[in-house]
């Protein structure tokens, strides 16, 4: 459905190739010097500029020294069911390297003079946390992606996560409440069959193959016409959680403090974040089950990130956006969108002054 917030007439900018086949679009004008960069990564199903509040951010950043970038990944649009976080963050690292070199060449000065911030929405937040918390470069080459080339990830001046929701708890919410006109009684048997099929197929994945699940079944649970591999299905649904969470299960509310220490708690050790991590949770996120206590969850993430006060990585302006939906795309989201934009502008302004 077309959002009333999409800008009519388009927005100006520059299309860049950061690899031969992947691009990033820079919202910018020629009238303002813009040495600083904010790279935005969307969630599952997103692509170039598909998150509607980007238009609000682009307008708000026009008079500042910041330019906003959006990008395509191999996993963009309907390819998320074949992707994985190592490949996503390798490509994000390539894009950031391109942006840093482009800005340094354009505006001069040292390579450290222009600030770089990475912002993720939804599953894009998983990319942000994966980028910051995993070994640098990544160390594992999966059998299903044998030509994956790991690259060294550059340190970031700042990082923002918006709507960091659990894909596992989102599907549990669907199983409890239904989806659209489908009841839980209709969805649950299909989901259980998919889980059984995926587990069986996962054994083949270890041998180097990645098996697609039937579209006729996955379309009852996930968006239609989207290829979904058994491997990614299990990573998103993480049936062994909370004891043994999958790669994609980073934000579930039932993960132990020990598990959070392996993700949020590793940001300090990896040393890839020079500044602060700001986390913005949507107060009325339709992907978050009613049983999740958002304030408690944010507090636990903060404690893990800051090692119970030993570090100061968590940004004080993190918090819940009142009445915000998941992507702030509904027609009643003007006030939450303004709240979000002001939070981001304040964060970026403080970063430059620091």
From Swiss-Prot:
Reactions it catalyzes: fusarinine C + 3 H2O = 3 fusarinine + Fe(3+)
Enzyme class: hydrolase
Pfam families xrefs: DUF1749 (PF08538)
Free-text disruption phenotype from the record: Leads to decreased growth and increased intracellular accumulation of hydrolysis products of the siderophore fusarinine C.
Keyword Transmembrane included in the entry's annotation: no
EC number: 3.1.-.-
Disulfide-bond pairs as recorded: none
Keyword list, A-Z: Hydrolase
MF terms (GO), sorted A to Z: hydrolase activity
Quaternary structure and partners: Homodimer.
Function of the protein: Displays specific fusarinine C (FsC) esterase activity but does not hydrolyze triacetylfusarinine C (TAFC), which has the same core structure as fusarinine C. Both extra- and intracellular siderophores have been shown to be crucial for the virulence. Subsequent to chelation of iron and uptake, FsC and TAFC are hydrolyzed and the iron is transferred to the metabolism or to the intracellular siderophore ferricrocin (FC) for transport and storage of iron.
Family as reported in the entry's similarity comment: Belongs to the sidJ hydrolase family.
Protein name stated in the entry: Fusarinine C esterase sidJ
Species this chain originates from: Aspergillus fumigatus (strain ATCC MYA-4609 / CBS 101355 / FGSC A1100 / Af293) (Neosartorya fumigata)
Upper taxonomic lineage: Eukaryota, Fungi, Dikarya, Ascomycota, Pezizomycotina
Gene name for this UniProt entry: sidJ
């Amino acid at each position: 459905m077309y959002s009333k917030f999409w800008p009519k007439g388009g927005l100006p900018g520059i299309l860049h190739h950061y690899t031969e086949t992947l691009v990033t679009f820079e919202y910018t004008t020629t009238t303002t010097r813009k040495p600083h960069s904010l790279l935005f990564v969307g969630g599952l199903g997103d692509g170039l500029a598909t998150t509607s509040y980007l238009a609000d951010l682009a307008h708000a950043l026009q008079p500042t020294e910041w330019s906003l970038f959006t990008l395509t990944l191999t996993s963009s649009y309907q390819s998320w069911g074949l992707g994985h976080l190592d490949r996503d963050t390798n490509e994000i690292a390539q894009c950031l390297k391109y942006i840093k070199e482009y800005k340094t060449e354009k505006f001069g000065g040292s390579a450290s003079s222009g600030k770089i911030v990475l912002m993720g929405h939804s599953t894009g937040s998983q990319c942000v946390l994966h980028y910051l918390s995993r070994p640098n470069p990544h160390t594992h080459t999966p059998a299903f992606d044998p030509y994956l080339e790991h690259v060294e990830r550059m340190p970031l001046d700042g990082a923002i996560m918006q709507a960091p929701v659990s894909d596992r708890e989102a599907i549990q919410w669907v199983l409890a409440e239904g989806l659209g006109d489908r009841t839980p009684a209709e969805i649950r048997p299909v989901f259980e069959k998919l889980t059984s099929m995926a587990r069986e197929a996962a054994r083949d994945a270890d041998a180097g193959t990645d098996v697609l699940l039937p579209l006729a079944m996955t379309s009852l649970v996930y968006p239609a016409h989207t290829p979904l591999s058994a491997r990614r299905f299990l990573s998103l649904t993480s049936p062994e959680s909370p004891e043994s969470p999958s790669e994609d299960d980073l934000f579930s509310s039932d993960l132990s403090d020990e598990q959070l220490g392996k993700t949020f708690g590793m940001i300090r050790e990896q040393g890839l974040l020079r500044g602060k991590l700001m986390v913005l949770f949507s107060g009325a996120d339709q992907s978050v089950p009613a049983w999740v206590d958002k304030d408690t969850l944010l507090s636990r993430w903060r404690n893990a990130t800051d090692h119970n006060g030993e570090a100061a990585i968590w940004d004080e302006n993190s918090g819940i956006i009142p009445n915000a939906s998941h992507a702030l795309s509904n027609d009643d989201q003007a006030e939450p969108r303004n709240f979000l934009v002001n939070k981001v502008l304040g964060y970026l302004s403080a970063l430059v002054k620091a």
